[in-house]
Structures are given as structure tokens and as C-alpha cells.
């Protein structure tokens, strides 16, 4: 399952540097990044956004962003890239390889 592999890759990269939690209420968000005891970022990971999962993946990220008052969320995929607005908040959809390159800076 490529989605599971991508999630594990992302988890291993962020878990070494930051405190990480999982969010689950009505929906789920894969990773919440904590800095100074405050949630600073929400990250959702899926291999590919498609008709079957797009709403679920974006809704999970959006719910976490709303609950923790985050203005921006990150959705990492294998190759897709776009930006969209959800309830006035920005969701950045980015290939995981581009995100990995930014971690090195």
C-alpha cells in the first residue's frame, strides 16, 4: 500500500525532529506537529487524491485546522500539486519529494 509507505516516510522524517500526534474525532488527520506545547501544523498524507478519497482527506485536514485554529494545512501526495481554500483557510497539496527537499534547508 503506497499510501501507508508515504505516511511512514513522513512520520519518520518529522518524528526525529518534532513532537507528533494523530488527530481523530469526526474525521482524521495523520499528523499534528507540536512546538512549544502548541499545535503549529496539520499534515495529511495520501498516495493520490481521487474521486473516492478527495473529500475525506481534505475534510480530515480541514477539521484539524479548524479545531486548532491553523490558517494553513499541508496535504502530501505522491505527485499532485495545487492550492485550494477551505472556509477561508489555505490547503497546500504538494508532492512528498518537494516537502522532503525543504526539510534539508
Segments the model singles out, each with a brief description of its role:
Residues 1-105:
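A cross-kingdom feature that marks ATP-driven nucleic-acid transaction machinery
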Amino acid at each position: 500500500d503506497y499510501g501507508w509507505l508515504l505516511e511512514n516516510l513522513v512520520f519518520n522524517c518529522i518524528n526525529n525532529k518534532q513532537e507528533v500526534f494523530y488527530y481523530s474525532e469526526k474525521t482524521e488527520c495523520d499528523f499534528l506537529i507540536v512546538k512549544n506545547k502548541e499545535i503549529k501544523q496539520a499534515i495529511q498524507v495520501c498516495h493520490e487524491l481521487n474521486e473516492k478519497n478527495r473529500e475525506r482527506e481534505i475534510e480530515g485536514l480541514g477539521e484539524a485546522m479548524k479545531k486548532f485554529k491553523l490558517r494553513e494545512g499541508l496535504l502530501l501526495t505522491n505527485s499532485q500539486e495545487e492550492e485550494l481554500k477551505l472556509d477561508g483557510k489555505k490547503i497546500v497539496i504538494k508532492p512528498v519529494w518537494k516537502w522532503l527537499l525543504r526539510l534539508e534547508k
